[in-house]
Amino acid sequence: MEENNGNNNHYLPQPSSSQLPPPPLYYQSMPLPSYSLPLPYSPQMRNYWIAQMGNATDVKHHAFPLTRIKKIMKSNPEVNMVTAEAPVLISKACEMLILDLTMRSWLHTVEGGRQTLKRSDTLTRSDISAATTRSFKFTFLGDVVPRDPSVVTDDPVLHPDGEVLPPGTVIGYPVFDCNGVYASPPQMQEWPAVPGDGEEAAGEIGGSSGGN
Amino acid sequence: MTEESPEEDHGSPGVAETNPGSPSSKTNNNNNNNKEQDRFLPIANVGRIMKKVLPGNGKISKDAKETVQECVSEFISFVTGEASDKCQREKRKTINGDDIIWAITTLGFEDYVAPLKVYLCKYRDTEGEKVNSPKQQQQRQQQQQIQQQNHHNYQFQEQDQNNNNMSCTSYISHHHPSPFLPVDHQPFPNIAFSPKSLQKQFPQQHDNNIDSIHW
């Protein structure tokens, strides 16, 4: 496994861990071990970093080349014309997505290092796979990142068939109550057709186990 | 940046635009195919943003960066497709910023919406300032490769008008009724009244600006 040996000089400010409960493990085991590494990111910290993107004062320089974004947008044959604002907004949204994915994945990097012999200071593809599996809003990445069957999704109602654990067991799984600390479930009111769409998408994802 | 087309952007598929404001970076993608590279955003930019939120001892494997590259491209296509569907339902052909924000909201990324709206307001304010401020207008003109030629022609006409008005100023300072006489016709009075000419040039230049706007 090739690693990025470059050290990051910008150290993340420590969150107020004394006010937050310790994060639970994905497998039921008590008591909780002591943590030697910084605490994984809470939703509050994640939202803090995402909000910082909106507070950027320099609106002239963009994190990504706008021409590349426009090419990706226009790879869809239905897309004809876009205003100048569209690639600018998407560039900023991509920054937020990368921060979001990185923080969720780092959560698994730290936890994974304690469960297995895997290094706990290197973020890898499997960490991203675990992070995208557990959050419903990353369902669209099913063809890009393979699902991690060892991770329990946050949405039991939308749990796909054929999963390792049947839906009934997942709902009653004790750890699930603690998972709420990490991510709030999606608001059902905003997706009237979520049950049907979710099941279809979940089914498709389950069928594409050979992806990448 | 495509700041000259706030309403629509008719970019041709094969035409590459100039983005002086975008940071240039080398892509570590092993695939040298140009089309393959265009499918993803530069991996260096992706890695730089990922490092922002990792602790000092955190490292990122190369396959993780490549995976995030793929996720970002999928996200762009996902949002663009949703925005395009909305435009088609509303019989519109151009995707604008509000369509993008709507699509991001609909697809479950509500956490991104408030910061994006803040950013969009700042972006629009900057555009407005550039249009109203002459200095910033010049700066923008320097950055706009496409508009440079047109502006050059306009500037040439403006300079020409300036010269004419300066001549008029010289004649007016001498209280001479006819503005079409050559300057060397009265050399001594011109030198004697140079201070008044300079003072009168300011309101004349102001009028000149109004005239140029009228043109």
UniProtKB/Swiss-Prot annotation, chain A:
Keyword hit for Transcription = yes
Q: Where is the composition biased (Polar residues)?
A: 1-10
- Write out the GO cellular component annotations: nucleus
- UniProt-listed Pfam families: CBFD_NFYB_HMF (PF00808)
Region Disordered: what ranges? 1-23, 190-212
Q: Where in the cell is it found?
A: Nucleus
Name the Gene Ontology molecular function terms of this record: DNA binding; DNA-binding transcription factor activity; protein heterodimerization activity
Q: Which UniProt keywords apply?
A: Activator, DNA-binding, Nucleus, Transcription, Transcription regulation
Quote the InterPro entries the UniProt record gives: CBFA_NFYB_domain, Histone-fold, Transcr_DNA_Rep_Reg
Q: Any keyword Oxidoreductase?
A: no
Coiled coil location: none
Instruction: Tell me which family the UniProt entry assigns to this protein.
Output: Belongs to the NFYC/HAP5 subunit family.
- What does the annotation say about its assembly with partners? Heterotrimeric transcription factor composed of three components, NF-YA, NF-YB and NF-YC. NF-YB and NF-YC must interact and dimerize for NF-YA association and DNA binding.
Q: What does this protein do?
A: Stimulates the transcription of various genes by recognizing and binding to a CCAAT motif in promoters.
Q: What is the protein name stated in its UniProt record? A: Nuclear transcription factor Y subunit C-7
State the gene name recorded for this protein. Answer: NFYC7
UniProtKB/Swiss-Prot annotation, chain B:
Tissues expressed in: Expressed in flowers and green siliques.
Q: Which residues bind DNA?
A: 41-47
A GO biological process of this protein is: response to water deprivation
List, alphabetically, the Pfam families matched. CBFD_NFYB_HMF (PF00808)
For whether the record's keyword set contains Transcription, the answer is yes
* Compartments in which it is found: Nucleus
- Give me the ranges of the annotated region Subunit association domain (SAD): 68-79
**Molecular-function annotations in GO:** DNA-binding transcription activator activity, RNA polymerase II-specific; DNA-binding transcription factor activity; protein heterodimerization activity; sequence-specific DNA binding
Supply the InterPro entries for this chain: CBFA_NFYB_domain, Histone-fold, Transc_fact_NFYB/HAP3, Transcrpt_fac_NFYB/HAP3_CS
Q: Disordered: where is this region?
A: 1-40, 130-151
The organism's superkingdom is given as Eukaryota
| Gene Ontology cellular component list | CCAAT-binding factor complex
Protein's UniProt keywords contain Transcription = yes
Listed A to Z, the keywords are: Activator, DNA-binding, Nucleus, Transcription, Transcription regulation
What ranges does the record list as Low complexity composition bias?
A: 136-151
Q: What does the induction field say?
A: Repressed by heat and dehydration stress.
Q: What interactions and quaternary structure are annotated?
A: Heterotrimeric transcription factor composed of three components, NF-YA, NF-YB and NF-YC. NF-YB and NF-YC must interact and dimerize for NF-YA association and DNA binding. Binds directly with DPB3-1.
**Family to which the UniProt record says this protein belongs:** Belongs to the NFYB/HAP3 subunit family.
Function statement: Component of the NF-Y/HAP transcription factor complex. The NF-Y complex stimulates the transcription of various genes by recognizing and binding to a CCAAT motif in promoters.
Name this polypeptide is given: Nuclear transcription factor Y subunit B-7
Taxonomic source organism:
Arabidopsis thaliana (Mouse-ear cress)
Report which gene this protein is encoded by: NFYB7
